[in-house]
Curated annotation (Swiss-Prot):
Name recorded for this polypeptide: tRNA/tmRNA (uracil-C(5))-methyltransferase
Record keyword Metal-binding present: no
Catalytic activity annotation: uridine(54) in tRNA + S-adenosyl-L-methionine = 5-methyluridine(54) in tRNA + S-adenosyl-L-homocysteine + H(+); uridine(341) in tmRNA + S-adenosyl-L-methionine = 5-methyluridine(341) in tmRNA + S-adenosyl-L-homocysteine + H(+)
GO molecular function: rRNA binding; tRNA (uracil(54)-C5)-methyltransferase activity, S-adenosyl methionine-dependent; tRNA binding
UniProt: S-adenosyl-L-methionine binding residues: 193, 221, 226, 242, 302
Length: 369
């Protein structure tokens, strides 16, 4: 990736030597990090070299009343750097960025605009969120509708306590995994995987690691069903939990979008779910689910950066197989200290979700000793 802001913009930290060098550094670092638990080959899944980010956030910097610019934090933490392009972002976002600023300025809706967020799909759909330090009135809505038509985008106007939606607040992403197509509605301001090509590879790896057996699957931290829905063809039934109400609603919508019928999504934290599973407490949210009908031998987890707590690790250890996707190698390392008391790590993978940074996503498969 060629970027004229390398070394100045804080979005990319590791840029000397190009893509292969930064990836090699990540691989070697994580081989050493996980050596106490796994000495086998770590499968490595590369990112596209540029235009890989399907969502991005930029500050807006005003130069008097004449001009507005995109801005990012400087790598040296000395304020911001003004930018006119970012080769990280998807081709659709890249092409839109200058057109959007010109339209905002031409239609005079830049007053107290402080940020712009982009969300795109592989097909080129884009939701643009315009963030303001002022109330948004009917005039804003009228102008935003004009810009939406001009640029063929969806627009969200956001201010404190306000969300003005022009047309719709989501894009429909199509993922291709091992020759199968999956559709997902990605909603603005909710978590989605930022690197679509690496996401497809993560799902594919996890599918191949899931054991083939006539049984059911339990998933914790299921989000909007990014993994759950592709997994559905491999199991009789899937029970998937997530604490976020909006994510559960999105997961149910995505299940319908893909015509999948063998998943039960439940809005519950892990602690509550364990109490329900063990019959300690009865929850109305579980009243339509016959827990005793599930034969679960495999658990899939994709926790937040904080990883799993000790109680969740103990719970996961009940099951014969554990597939763990981690967005923080340090917390995965901590959790493996507990999980390997009962399980062996038999396979690992590294996914380069965020090129030119120190960040890596990891996958681990564990089986009971």
């Amino acid at each position: 990736m060629n970027c004229k802001y390398f070394g100045i913009c804080g979005a990319c930290i590791v840029y000397d030597g190009g893509y292969e060098t930064q990836l090699s550094q990540k691989v070697e670092l994580n081989k050493e990090l996980f050596a106490p638990f796994y000495m086998g080959k770590i499968s490595v899944f590369e990112s596209p070299r540029s235009n890989y980010r399907s969502r991005s956030e930029f500050k807006i910097w005003h130069e008097g009343d004449e001009k507005i610019n995109y801005a990012m934090n400087r790598a040296d933490k000395g304020g911001v750097i003004l930018i006119d392009e970012c080769p990280q972002v998807s081709s659709a976002i890249f092409a839109l960025m200058p057109k959007l600023l010109r339209a905002i300025k031409r239609h005079k809706i830049d007053f107290k605009l402080f940020g712009v967020d982009f969300l795109s799909s592989n097909s080129g759909e884009i939701v643009v969120s315009l963030l303001y330090h002022r109330a948004l009135d009917s005039t804003f809505k009228e102008i935003a509708e004009i810009i939406s038509d001009e640029l063929d985008i969806y627009i969200i106007g956001r201010s404190r306590g306000q969300k003005v939606v022009i047309k719709q607040d989501y894009v429909t992403e199509i993922l291709h995994v091992d020759g199968v197509e999956f559709k997902f509605n990605y909603i603005e301001n909710s978590f989605t995987q930022p690197n679509a090509k690496v996401n497809e590879q993560m799902i594919g790896w996890a599918l191949r690691e899931l054991p083939n057996m006539d049984a059911d699957l339990l998933e914790l931290y299921c989000g909007a069903g990014n993994f759950t829905i592709p997994f559905a063809s491999k199991y009789r039934k899937i029970l998937a939990t997530e604490i976020s109400k909006s994510s559960i609603n999105a997961a149910k919508s995505n299940m319908s979008l893909n015509k999948v019928k063998n998943i039960s999504f439940v809005r519950m934290g892990v602690e509550e779910f364990v109490e329900a599973l063990d019959g300690v407490r009865i929850f109305n949210r579980m009243k339509e689910i016959d827990i005793d009908s599930y034969e679960i031998k495999t658990i899939f987890v994709d926790p937040p950066r904080s990883g799993m707590d000790e109680a969740t690790c103990r719970f996961a250890s009940r099951y014969e197989n554990i597939i763990y996707i981690s967005c923080n190698p340090q917390t995965l390392l901590r959790d493996l200290e507990l999980l390997t008391k009962t399980h062996n790590v038999i396979d690992m993978a590294l996914f380069d979700q965020f090129p030119y940074t120190h960040h890596a996503e990891m996958g681990a498969k564990l089986v009971k000793k």
